[in-house]
Amino acid sequence: GKHVAIEVPAAMNLDECWQLINTSEKTRKHCMILENCCYDWFEMNTLNMAQQGVFGEVIRAQGAYIHNLSPFWNHYWKNGEGDKLGWRLDYNMKHRGDVYATHGLGPVAQALDIHRGDRMQTLVAMDTKSVVGKALVEARTDSACNGFRNGDHTTTLIRTANGKVIEIQHNVMTPQPYNRLYQLTGSKGFANKYPVEGYALDADQLTASGVQPKVDDLNSHGFLPEAEMEALVAKYQHPILKKYGEMAKEVGGHGGMDFIMDSRLVYCLQNGLPLDMDVYDLAEWCCLAELGELSMDNNCAPVAFPDFTRGEWNVVKGYKHAYAAPEEEAAAMEKAKAFTAKLKEQGAKEWAQAEKK
């Protein structure tokens, strides 16, 4: 078998989640969800701050996928000329729940150490009625739509075993700015990405974090001024961004976070390290679709999360990125370079032979 990396959302129901887990465990092969939003600059630096205790104990988190897809509905794959909706609009019409949760949930789950000392235990989901979605179907089919399942806006509340709360939102219908929220509320500080990036810390924590106020009235009633925020980010810049950040900006790919994600995947595989996101992350982040549907179809009842780790969620203490020792990293890099050179040499020979024919 081969190690596998799957584009988000990777699994759309519990059965698919368990199939991936069982296969990964049986074959002893990695199965990583390609959640690029875990590698954006604000999320990575904020994760490092959270892990260093800057916000105290993080007790609440928010994430979202709010993205008006009106310019894109006509560009999704269609199953022949008779398909007026395209696969994505059709899927939203037939399925309730947060069907694209991982962009919002992934980064906050890492900050809360999910299945590394805590686990998501119960959720309650609510949605609005479908107004925009229903109108989209009617406009494309020229007929009444009496059953658009996915509400225009879905909100899922999750409580963890350790008493933390996560709020995840999904809205691809209404006209509003792109928003993944990404908000952490801690006992000593606060972080927020959308719509305005900022940090707020209590006075003692500000001093403890080594950021000295330059104004007299600096307090947690407002975000840190720009200079203090830049100093905080500089102090807690994530090691992965130090290594890949500038190169990622040059290469691009969703601002560079795709490059960082791919680089970390390759790095971990080359060095024999645990991946940044495992098959249990995949299942936990993707299962909101079916669990939320179960909740809303039963009068927004609480629904229990399966323990995809089969009781092992509290064995590893704290989410961490894995790193090789410098000498091991250098050896793996040289080995990879030699292998790549060999492939290029072989490819050039085969290409030359093909041109002669």
Where are these regions (language model features)?
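Beta-strand-loop-alpha-helix segment that lines the small-molecule cofactor/substrate pocket
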Residues: 1-39, 53
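Aromatic/hydrophobic pocket-lining residues that form π-stacking "cages" and hydrophobic walls in ligand
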Residues: 20, 46, 291
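Ligand-binding pocket scaffold of soluble enzyme catalytic domains
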Residues: 21, 27-28, 65, 257, ...
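Predominantly a Rossmann-like dinucleotide-binding segment in NAD(P)-dependent oxidoreductases
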Residues: 26-32, 37-148
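Short glycine/serine/proline-enriched coil/turn segments at secondary-structure junctions
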Residues: 69-71, 174-177
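A short catalytic or substrate-binding loop motif that flags glycine-/basic-rich loops and adjacent residues
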Residues: 102-103, 147-152, 160-161, 175-176
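C-terminal helical cap and adjacent loop that interface with cofactors, partners, or active-site loops
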Residues: 109, 177-185, 192-195, 201-357
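Active-site beta-strand termini and strand-to-loop segments that position acidic
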Residues: 156-162, 186
